Amino acid sequence: MFIDTAKIFVKSGKGGDGSISFRREKYIAFGGPDGGDGGKGGNVVLVVDPNMTTLLDFTYKRKYKAEPGGNGAGSKCFGKNGKDLHIKVPMGTIVKDAETDKIMADLSKPEDSYVVAKGGRGGKGNCRFTTPTRQAPDFAEPGMPEEERWIKLELKLLADVGLIGFPNVGKSTLLSVVSKARPKIANYHFTTLKPNLGVVSIEGVNNFVIADIPGIIEGASEGVGLGLDFLRHVERTRVLIHVIDISSVEGRDPYDDFLKINDELKRYSVKLYDRPQIIAANKSDMLFDEEKFEEFKTKVEKHGYNKVFKISAATKQGVDDLMKEAARLLSTIPVTDLEISEEDRFIEEEKRFTYSIRKEDNTYIVEGSFVDRLLNAVNVNDPDDLRYFHKVLKNKGVMEELMEMGIEDGDVVRLNDFEFDFLL
């Protein structure tokens, strides 16, 4: 089975909490704080595996979670870092955020990897908060929360040349002749239900990868037939070989087929439509009127397609010349990465350390993940903790933003269940 799309849930590891601890040893008075930091949570990392060819594995397992960081401990013992979780994906995998449908990564090289969910940073232990005026802090930071999201994986074949054309025009036969690939071949439409790859090796030219893409029909750009499943794989190729049944044994007009396929390419992507295209007039061994080929060639050339080859995949007539021309064209076209527009690119939002302020009557309400994290770290009933609390609010710009909003002495500031009067 060929699976080329998948949707999975990923969750990184939470950062370990910092420790609140004081040194307690016989004969050592006032040992001081010795709480260690929490460990970092594990990342979820997508890693290219060149041996994988489909996304089939993700139909059986859809949820992936990395290891959390260990909590800090006394004696300045740091928590253990959580292990990263590596998820193998095939080359040519596009990673998208499921919520926004924006592209996060294009994993198209053997060494490619991408951190799709970052582990939370470990919280600082209380030994980190000592100052000349705060000798015994009894607070520590909690670990940063984990990241979690649903992501979509789309596999796009990494082939140099794509064979396109209506069903049953001989694409699979051509692939089997020019490579060692053995696709299913039969005399009915949509025999090929998944893309097949083969390596073309001809003396005197560089080897290249060719893909037999499932047949396209009218309306494919709107999802008809194999539709978008077909077109997704054509995007990666640098050269297209447009296979036409010149014999018309099924009653179709070759020129009409040529126009319809190119119209679908153009509807789907202008860049795809403009890609170099070689026309392969196949099944010429069944053509009994040579004028029909010349007439077809003349019409096609008027559209700017000057590379028209009369071939027979069944008898191998003209096939070598066709492949040599494909190799020549490839040598003139550099390999480029998938272009991702700014509109389509996923922008990571920092959700783990944010806040917002709104005003209700004379009360200013500060809320968000920043507030939750700060209040979890301090004891608001302790004077030392409160001094640290106000220092953090000032350093993070909360006080400045409150003043810009017009706060006055005596106005109430609320952070979750904790309230205090604002004083300049």
Swiss-Prot record:
Positions of transmembrane segments: none
Domain of life: Bacteria
A Pfam family matched in the record: DUF1967
Subcellular location: Cytoplasm
GO cellular component terms attached to this protein's record: cytoplasm
One example of a Gene Ontology biological process annotation: ribosome biogenesis
Protein name, UniProt field: GTPase Obg
Lineage per the UniProt record: Bacteria, Bacillati, Bacillota, Clostridia, Eubacteriales
Gene label: obg
